């Protein structure tokens, strides 16, 4: 093709970014290339897909997304657009959701004893201030990159893996990601470039755990993503013990309170509510104001107006 219509950046040969030798760098300065990219997206939307996860979205000029995605929304109302990146500008007229990478690495650090619940509270405030209120933040303990290159959640988080998963379902503005195999506690690093079949699916305690998390989220408006959900309040304030992440979210007449021990030591605290409430996972009744002890990496969840369910231990 001619230089004017070439969709690739070249210096003699096509330019390759990083060591991605199978991916030539596109020329986003070429209007014809941009139009071709939009046409390719329409091709798949015409076939009924729900939307796109855009890989390395921050490596593409923001103005391309801001030019292309609103036009697609007009033609295909209700599409879902996820950016693999977390620059606030990605939400400026472009994406619905972005990856909460900083949170992911923070959860790893807390599990490994390098960071604390106080660091998590600071993150929640910082992210809420940086991101638009309507932004969905994709939260995860594993994904295809982290599993293959950094290890499974069990390698990185050990005994903290489940409480960290709970946080991805309950923290403000979050939209949880469950990676292949997590729903059955599959402790295996998938080969990134080679065939590595997923084993036969078997229901177990992890399946019940994730099913409970999904039900908790779906039946509680307070846990909705973006502007529909509640922001974090900290009922114990400065009386919150080190190691404890205790927060409440309220929306639509619904309240969810999460108490998570993010340390390798037990933690004691007073339940910050009046009257009695049933804990979501166990169905056990707790009286507000009473002294409670949480073992290492354990949690309590109190959801208002939600019928209790019981799950088996993994």
PLM features: what roles do these ranges have?
Residues 13-37:
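Chitinase-like catalytic core of GlcNAc-active glycosidases
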Residues 40-42, 50-140, 167-170, 185-215, ...:
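Active-site-proximal helices and loops of the catalytic beta/alpha 8
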Residues 1-8, 310-314:
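Short, small-residue-biased leader/transition segments that mark boundaries at the very start
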Residues 179, 187-256:
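Glycan-recognition and catalytic regions of carbohydrate-active enzymes
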Residues 30-44, 161-165:
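Short, acidic/polar
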Residues 288-308, 312:
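C-terminal beta-strand-rich structural cap/linker in extracellular carbohydrate-active enzymes
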Residues 262-274:
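Surface-exposed beta-strand/loop patches in extracellular or lumenal glycoproteins
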Residues 133-156:
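Active-site clefts of carbohydrate-active enzymes
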């Amino acid at each position: 093709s001619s230089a004017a219509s070439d969709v690739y950046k070249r210096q003699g040969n096509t330019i390759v970014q990083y060591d991605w030798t199978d991916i030539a760098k596109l020329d986003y300065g070429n209007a014809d290339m941009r139009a071709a990219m939009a046409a390719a997206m329409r091709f798949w939307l015409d076939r009924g897909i729900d939307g796109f996860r855009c890989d390395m979205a921050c490596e593409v000029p923001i103005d391309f997304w801001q030019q292309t995605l609103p036009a697609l929304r007009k033609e295909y109302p209700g599409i879902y657009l996820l950016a693999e990146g977390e620059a606030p500008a990605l939400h400026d007229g472009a994406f619905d959701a972005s990856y909460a990478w900083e949170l992911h690495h923070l959860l790893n650090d807390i599990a490994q004893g390098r960071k604390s619940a106080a660091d998590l509270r600071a993150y929640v405030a910082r992210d809420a201030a940086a991101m638009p209120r309507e932004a969905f933040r994709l939260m995860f303990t594993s994904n295809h990159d982290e599993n293959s290159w950094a290890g499974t959640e069990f390698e990185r988080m050990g005994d903290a893996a489940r409480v960290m998963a709970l946080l991805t379902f309950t923290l403000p503005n979050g939209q949880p990601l469950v990676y292949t195999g997590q729903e059955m506690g599959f402790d295996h690093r998938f080969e990134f470039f080679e065939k590595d079949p997923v084993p036969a699916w078997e229901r177990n305690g992890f399946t019940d755990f994730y099913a409970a998390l999904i039900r908790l989220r779906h039946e509680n408006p307070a846990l909705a993503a973006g502007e529909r959900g509640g922001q974090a309040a900290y009922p114990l304030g400065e009386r919150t013990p080190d190691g404890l992440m205790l927060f409440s979210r309220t929306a639509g007449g619904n309240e969810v309170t999460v108490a998570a021990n993010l340390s390798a030591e037990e933690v004691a605290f007073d339940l910050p509510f009046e009257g009695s409430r049933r804990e979501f996972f166990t169905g056990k009744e707790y009286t507000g104001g009473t002294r409670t002890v949480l073992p290492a990496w354990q949690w309590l969840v109190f959801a208002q107006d939600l019928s209790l369910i019981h799950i088996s231990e993994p």
